[in-house]
């Protein structure tokens, strides 16, 4: 099947992007270089095209109640203008996908409630099929909310200043995981237009994710870059999220790993009376304990551990690297991996098979990097 292009495909090429296929899309892997882009986000700000992500609305009577049957997080902890990170689960408690749920409140003339979900590109169709199948009796409308539009991620400590400079709008009143819809205009797009903006991201930095129409998206992209924001590709997005200890679906989490095993137990609210798919499996795991856990590893020396590299302990195979890279911020090799529970204590030494040699790796505290305000 031919890979799809985002509306910013040509715009990214004009900025010097090197493209790769990712989850069925042609996406920029880098522009000026991974390390430069990574450091720009850590120190200033960077802009990502994430229009490959799935964005869907679920609208009708009590959509949060309906979605609550599919996720382990208490969705009633958020209200209009707020959002939360959670996961879809199968019957075994395995993770079908991770997603963000945004409560849009009642914004329809029919007085219907609406929530927005943002899901991973490679899981989009399977996720929507799963949701529609299990909510088929709820009389809800599940619609593609992105259409042919653009989804941008502006990330970094200077993000708020950059948006204020370009949009002329102060966004300091949007808290972390807050969101709102606002009317704005640009120098190159003088007709005012609506954007959905959320203070969310996948880098470990402050930042925003912005949904808007294609023409406005192209204009905003160009004006931010002209204002000094660095265009960034998936390469930097991966190293940034890895340093921040954020899992990547298909690598660090999948339908055979549970939230407790993945270090996402904080997403599970078993104390609520709500029933959800996978709850029984998670209750059982709470009572019996877990056999493996996703840990952070620091690789000694200059070696880089990649996905699939074998991990040994006392000459026995004990696991595989799920994600690994060189950390531009820490200047050392870092990785994530599932290890047997008795090897997950911080400071434990294991060995990673990198090419033909065994390299020592030390279990470290997650995340590798955390922004100090």
UniProtKB/Swiss-Prot annotation:
<dbReference type="InterPro" id="IPR022903">
    <property type="entry name" value="GCS_T_bac"/>
</dbReference>
<dbReference type="InterPro" id="IPR028896">
    <property type="entry name" value="GcvT/YgfZ/DmdA"/>
</dbReference>
<protein>
    <recommendedName>
        <fullName>Aminomethyltransferase</fullName>
        <ecNumber>2.1.2.10</ecNumber>
    </recommendedName>
</protein>
<dbReference type="GO" id="GO:0019464">
    <property type="term" value="P:glycine decarboxylation via glycine cleavage system"/>
</dbReference>
<dbReference type="GO" id="GO:0004047">
    <property type="term" value="F:aminomethyltransferase activity"/>
</dbReference>
<comment type="similarity">
    <text>Belongs to the GcvT family.</text>
</comment>
<keyword id="KW-0032">Aminotransferase</keyword>
<dbReference type="Pfam" id="PF01571">
    <property type="entry name" value="GCV_T"/>
</dbReference>
<dbReference type="GO" id="GO:0005960">
    <property type="term" value="C:glycine cleavage complex"/>
</dbReference>
<dbReference type="InterPro" id="IPR006222">
    <property type="entry name" value="GCV_T_N"/>
</dbReference>
<dbReference type="InterPro" id="IPR013977">
    <property type="entry name" value="GCST_C"/>
</dbReference>
<dbReference type="InterPro" id="IPR027266">
    <property type="entry name" value="TrmE/GcvT_dom1"/>
</dbReference>
<dbReference type="GO" id="GO:0008483">
    <property type="term" value="F:transaminase activity"/>
</dbReference>
<dbReference type="InterPro" id="IPR029043">
    <property type="entry name" value="GcvT/YgfZ_C"/>
</dbReference>
<keyword id="KW-0808">Transferase</keyword>
<comment type="function">
    <text>The glycine cleavage system catalyzes the degradation of glycine.</text>
</comment>
<dbReference type="GO" id="GO:0005829">
    <property type="term" value="C:cytosol"/>
</dbReference>
<dbReference type="Pfam" id="PF08669">
    <property type="entry name" value="GCV_T_C"/>
</dbReference>
<comment type="subunit">
    <text>The glycine cleavage system is composed of four proteins: P, T, L and H.</text>
</comment>
<dbReference type="InterPro" id="IPR006223">
    <property type="entry name" value="GCS_T"/>
</dbReference>
């Amino acid at each position: 099947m031919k890979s799809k292009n985002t509306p910013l495909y040509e715009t990214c090429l004009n900025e010097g992007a090197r493209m790769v296929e990712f989850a069925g899309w042609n996406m920029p892997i880098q522009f000026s270089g991974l390390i430069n882009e990574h450091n720009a986000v850590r120190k200033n700000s960077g802009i990502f095209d994430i229009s490959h992500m799935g964005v869907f609305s679920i609208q009708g009577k009590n959509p949060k109640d309906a979605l609550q049957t599919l996720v382990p997080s208490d969705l009633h902890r958020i209200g209009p203008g707020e959002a939360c990170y959670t996961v879809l689960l199968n019957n075994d408690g395995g993770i079908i996908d991770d997603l963000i749920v945004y409560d849009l409140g009642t914004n329809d003339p029919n007085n219907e409630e609406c929530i927005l979900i943002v899901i991973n590109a490679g899981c989009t169709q399977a996720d929507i099929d799963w949701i529609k199948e299990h909510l088929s009796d709820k009389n809800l409308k599940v619609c593609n909310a992105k259409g042919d539009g653009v989804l941008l991620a502006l990330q970094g400590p200077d993000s708020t200043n950059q948006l204020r400079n370009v949009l002329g709008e102060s966004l300091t009143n949007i808290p972390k995981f807050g969101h709102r819809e606002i009317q704005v205009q640009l120098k190159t797009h003088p007709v005012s237009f609506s954007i959905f903006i959320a203070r969310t991201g996948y880098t470990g930095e402050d930042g925003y994710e912005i949904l808007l129409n294609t023409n406005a998206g192209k204009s905003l992209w160009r004006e931010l870059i002209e204002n000094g924001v660095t265009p960034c590709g998936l390469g930097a997005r991966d190293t940034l999220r890895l340093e921040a200890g954020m899992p990547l679906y298909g690598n660090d989490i999948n339908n055979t790993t549970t939230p407790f095993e993945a270090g996402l137990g904080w997403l599970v609210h078993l104390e609520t009376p709500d029933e959800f798919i996978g709850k029984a499996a998670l209750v059982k795991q709470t009572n019996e304990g877990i056999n493996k856990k996703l840990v952070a590893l620091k690789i000694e020396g200059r070696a880089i551990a990649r996905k699939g590299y074998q991990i040994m302990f006392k000459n026995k195979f004990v696991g595989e690297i799920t994600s690994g890279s060189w950390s531009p911020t820490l200047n050392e090799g870092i990785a994530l991996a599932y290890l047997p529970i008795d090897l997950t204590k911080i400071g434990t030494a294991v060995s990673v098979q990198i090419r033909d040699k065994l390299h020592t790796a030390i279990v470290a505290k997650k995340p590798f990097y955390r922004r100090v305000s």
